[in-house]
């Protein structure tokens, strides 16, 4: 299916690109989440009329994400979990836990924005974590996991 991207999509393209994707990806994800639209002649003409407006909105989102990223970059978040004697946690620290902890510090971060490439944190100590505020803005945060002896 041919679609027009209404915003930048990772591994697919930028605003205004006309790309071919599988029908299910377009129907079930891109179109319902307002990231794309079917590439018909009328849709292409309507997009060209709204292009400047969409580019301005995308630039504003990027500027807001960069401003938030400057505040968030290098922050340390402390999370306490029950742990054993050997420093391994009972359970784990997930991206949702990190997003909640950042929220208590005044940062608006959703759990989908927290990137844990090696999976949930399962040991006590400091762990570097990437937070993707925008497709072009990724900042590093240190998560200090403190163990509570049981």
From Swiss-Prot:
GO terms for molecular function: rRNA binding; structural constituent of ribosome. One of its GO terms (cellular component) is ribosome. Keywords: Ribonucleoprotein, Ribosomal protein, RNA-binding, rRNA-binding. Pfam families: Ribosomal_L9_C, Ribosomal_L9_N. One of its GO terms (biological process) is translation. It comes from the Bacteria. InterPro entries: Ribosomal_bL9, Ribosomal_bL9/RNase_H1_N, Ribosomal_bL9_bac/chp, Ribosomal_bL9_C, Ribosomal_bL9_C_sf, Ribosomal_bL9_N, Ribosomal_bL9_N_sf. Belongs to the bacterial ribosomal protein bL9 family. Binds to the 23S rRNA. NCBIfam families: L9. This is Large ribosomal subunit protein bL9. It comes from Cupriavidus pinatubonensis (strain JMP 134 / LMG 1197) (Cupriavidus necator (strain JMP 134)). The gene is rplI.
